[in-house]
Every structure is written in structure tokens, then in C-alpha cells.
């Protein structure tokens, strides 16, 4: 079950580069793992961060499920003994322009494209629309000092990948469980691929590195 301690412990032992968890603020002011608002007991993010201390080579993608958590999550990570390079943000992130000060700028952001282009997933799949979106998000990334955009795999067309690449913007693509599609995106230079098929992903990555 995702967002459970059992899932976290399993993911940490798979050899994956990063673990993704859903983060929100509980009613008692404690950061928890939960996709939706809940009254039930949930895993505390502090417990997960403590577990992460045993895996210094692994990163944790905190998928923020509500706005305004950037400072609190960073502070908790530091208190828990993690380096800021070990955490990254996706989800409901509100980026700050590079011309302004930002206490959490040292945390890498995988910026969800719908945070800037809210109608992107309502559009019909047309290469021209996605190409235009790639130019728009690339310009916005420069404004906010962001280097990686997080998109659903249906948006990761050849044109979208080409345009973002030409603008020095990396891609994080979700959720790719099909091996053929995984290999295709890897071959196109996609920086990060989120998958539930961790065994397949690790095997493909291992083959790529040894070849």
C-alpha cells in the first residue's frame, strides 16, 4: 500500500534512485504521508526521513498535496539529518522568481506542468499544442530558476522532449510501467521516470549501464 511504512521500507531496498511519497499537513500540524485529506492515522514524514538516513545515496520526492509546505518540509529534513540534495519537491509547489529571495531554493523542484498550464491535460493530444506548451513552460522555468518539468507520459512526445531539451530543461515523466515505453524515454534522455514496476526499471537501467 502506497504511503505506508511497509511500502517505504520496500522501496528503499529496491535499488531505485528515488522514492516518491504524498505529503500534506495533518490536522495537528504534523507532516504526514497521505494523498487525500484524512482523519485516520497516517505515517509521519519525520519517521520516513529518519529511515532515509540509512540510505544516503537515495533521494525522496515529496509530492506536495497542498500549497505552502515547502519551508516546513525542508526544515523537517534538516532536523532529521538529511541534506537538502536528498529531497526534492513536486506537486503543489509555488516557485519564487530568481530575482527574489527564497529560503528553500536549495531544494530541487520537479515542477508539475499543470501548476503553470492548468488546462494542459484537458487538451486533445496534438503535437502542436504540446510543442507550444513546451516553449511556454521553458520560459517560465527560466523565470523561476527551475531545471526539471514533471509531466504525464502522454505529454512526453518527441516534439515536447526536443523543445524542452533545446531550452536546457530536463524532464521527469510519470507513470511509466510499460518496458518498451520506459526504454524509449530513457533513450530520449529523459532525466527521471516514475514507475510502479521498479524491478523492470532497475533491470533496464542495469542493462543500459553495462552495455
Task: Annotate the PLM regions.
Residues 1-211:
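Phosphate-group recognition and catalysis centered on beta-loop-alpha active-site segments
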